[in-house]
Amino acid sequence: MNVTSLFSFTSPAVKRLLGWKQGDEEEKWAEKAVDALVKKLKKKKGAMEELEKALSCPGQPSNCVTIPRSLDGRLQVSHRKGLPHVIYCRVWRWPDLQSHHELKPLECCEFPFGSKQKEVCINPYHYKRVESPVLPPVLVPRHSEYNPQHSLLAQFRNLGQNEPHMPLNATFPDSFQQPNSHPFPHSPNSSYPNSPGGSSSTYPHSPTSSDPGSPFQMPADTPPPAYLPPEDPMAQDGSQPMDTNMMAPPLPAEISRGDVQAVAYEEPKHWCSIVYYELNNRVGEAFHASSTSVLVDGFTDPSNNKNRFCLGLLSNVNRNSTIENTRRHIGKGVHLYYVGGEVYAECLSDSSIFVQSRNCNYHHGFHPTTVCKIPSGCSLKIFNNQEFAQLLAQSVNHGFETVYELTKMCTIRMSFVKGWGAEYHRQDVTSTPCWIEIHLHGPLQWLDKVLTQMGSPHNPISSVS
């Protein structure tokens, strides 16, 4: 049955446009979304014809089809608010679209959503879906002068407990700056301290580091750079096209290709696991994320939805009144999504969430243990596979311990409602009533394979390893 026959009371224009609707999108909601669009486009000469041309001839060039941009950039359709280009890309191209982070405008688009013009283009064929970048393999030297001092990945869940600093605090978007160009050094001559032409844009390392060749070392009292608020909080992912050929550093002259082992990144079955804590007590079983879009909320879900981790279902006999009250305020919680090799956290709760992500802190030039406050309605990129890949590729030439340090980057901590750090009376995440720990399986497994190739005290690197 043609989808247009389902709507006997809609206008001919709406019926025509619904003919190109993708089948999985909700029928009634799609009808209302298209009807709202038709009313706007009828006020513009030729706009309807241009949209129909784009939908009927997807491979042919088409012009922008624009509607006025609202104050908050969103469009309301039947009690649901969303970004207009996401709504219509979902209706006509990708029913499984979750977020604007999954879309990039084509170069031909004159009014892309991120440009903050008075008009925004909703032509679904002026956007493309973000693809996961292919990460180059890490080249691990077969011979090493380093003497590994650690065993392989132990219980990484406790890695951050001995940090000597009380975490600093930052608030999104106020404390964040929009990177002017590439978010980190991007040329062979501008990399890290202790390398030729090292840049000052570094990842400050814990002062307890004893490795003089560490690419992350920086005095503990070095102040962070001045921060400027970003131009557009909605587009605050700072993403730039990255030349993946630049990510693996050139091999030293004395090492030939035959002296290295290539270790490739592999996408795991579950991209992350999430563990819930109340104070310093783990509560319930770990949640393993198979979907790239996961909700962690304070409700109960008897249907056992694989895309939701419902904290309301979990019981704890040691729960006190502070924890009970905090749990009541988690509400819609946080939306985590993994797209294009990047992890985003969107705060759906009416209360803020607080995130400690070393990868995010590295990207923004913060101290590694900084805790970032994400207010309600905001989203922040909390992990980038490409940046992690570059750090890993550079770390293998600094020895086992430097690579092992990166395990800390693969665990993200997130507190609901209550913050912790220098600006709060709670100094550690284990003092917050309700928090989660996110373990990123892909980067962790990649590290594990690299460390295995590098050897351990029980398996020293040799010419026959």
From Swiss-Prot:
Where in this protein does the record put region L3 loop?
Answer: 418-428
Q: Where is the MH2 domain?
A: 271-465
GO terms under cellular component: chromatin; cytoplasm; heteromeric SMAD protein complex; homomeric SMAD protein complex; male germ cell nucleus; nuclear inner membrane; nucleoplasm; nucleus
Q: List each copy of the MH1 domain by range.
A: 12-136
Q: Which Cys pairs are S-S linked?
A: none
Cite the entry's keywords alphabetically: Acetylation, Cytoplasm, DNA-binding, Metal-binding, Nucleus, Phosphoprotein, Transcription, Transcription regulation, Ubl conjugation, Zinc
* Annotated Zn(2+) binding sites: 64, 109, 121, 126
**Where is the sequence biased in composition, kind Pro residues?**
221-232
Chain positions with N-acetylmethionine modification: 1
Q: Does the keyword Mitochondrion apply?
A: no
Q: How does it assemble?
A: Found in a complex with SMAD4 and YY1. Interacts with HGS, NANOG and ZCCHC12. Upon C-terminus phosphorylation: forms trimers with another SMAD1 and the co-SMAD SMAD4. Interacts with PEBP2-alpha subunit, CREB-binding protein (CBP), p300, SMURF1, SMURF2, USP15 and HOXC8. Associates with ZNF423 or ZNF521 in response to BMP2 leading to activate transcription of BMP target genes. Interacts with SKOR1. Interacts (via MH2 domain) with LEMD3. Binding to LEMD3 results in at least a partial reduction of receptor-mediated phosphorylation.
| Protein name stated in the entry | Mothers against decapentaplegic homolog 1
Q: Which organism is it from?
A: Mus musculus
